[in-house]
Structures are given as C-alpha cells and as structure tokens.
Amino acid sequence: MLAAEPRSLLRRLNATCTRALEAAAAACVGARHYEVTAEHLLVALLDDRESDVAVVFGHYRADVEGARGQAKRALSSLRDGNPGKPVFSPLLLEWVQDAWVYASAELGEASVRSGALLVRAALAAGRYFPSELPALEALPSDELRRRLGELARTSAEAAAAAPAGAP
C-alpha cells in the first residue's frame, strides 16, 4: 500500500535512479505500454554500468544479461497500444517507497540509490515483479541487505550518497 504521494516519493530518487526512471518512461512510451513498471526501471538500471546495481551484479558474478533478458521478456507480454501518456505502476511506486524506507532507515541516506532498489527487489521480487526473475532472485538478499554500502562502495552512486539530514 502506498503511504506517500507519488510525486514526493519520486523526488527521493538520486540522480542515477532519476535518469533510469526517465529512460524507463521513454521505453514505456516507445513500446506504447500503459504503465511504467518495475521491469522498465530494472532494465534501465541494468543498463547503467556505473550504478550500484552493476557493481553488485559484478561482485556476485550475477547474470546481468540474463536478468535484462528476463525483464525484457516480461515487458514483451504487457498490453500495448497506448496512444497517450503512461502512468506509473502501483507496484513500481511501492518498490520505490520500500527502497526509500530501507535507504533512509537502514542506510541513513537522504535519497534512494539503485542499490536500495536492488535490495528490496532481491528480498521480495515477487511483490514488485509479476513475472519470475531467477537472476534477481539468485542474489543473496540478506547478505546484500547487510553489506550494500561495502559492496557498492566503488559505484558512482556511492560517491554522491549523502547522509539523511545533509543539505
């Protein structure tokens, strides 16, 4: 259930996630889908080689191409033909909200980075993604939750991360 106003929630995304969300929305429009989904955003995050997501996948030697392909297959099954502007999927917004709670409460950060989204997705992929994503589900979610800061310290997002309460 969404507790925050979507617009306020999306403003909590860091620059990397905001760019990925913009790319996800553009892909959605290009495919004439009705909703920007978690799969759209996941594909965009997997495409950014300097994000937390890329660094974490690299650390675990996880199958980036497999995850991208699985998400794209899920997208190919979405209803298309939308002549207008798509909306954000409620599941996408819940994913961002849950990542915001994790980022602020557990990481003490002022914005949502892609690693926080990845942690929430790894912990509860079935909640945000209607299709199975074995490459995502194979990540050691509990370890990732505990060690995200350490694992993603070399990402471009880590350098830009600001603690909660920072200007």
Question: At which residue positions do the language-model features occur?
Answer:
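Histone-fold recognition with a strong bias for associated Lys/Arg-rich disordered tails
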Residues: 1-167
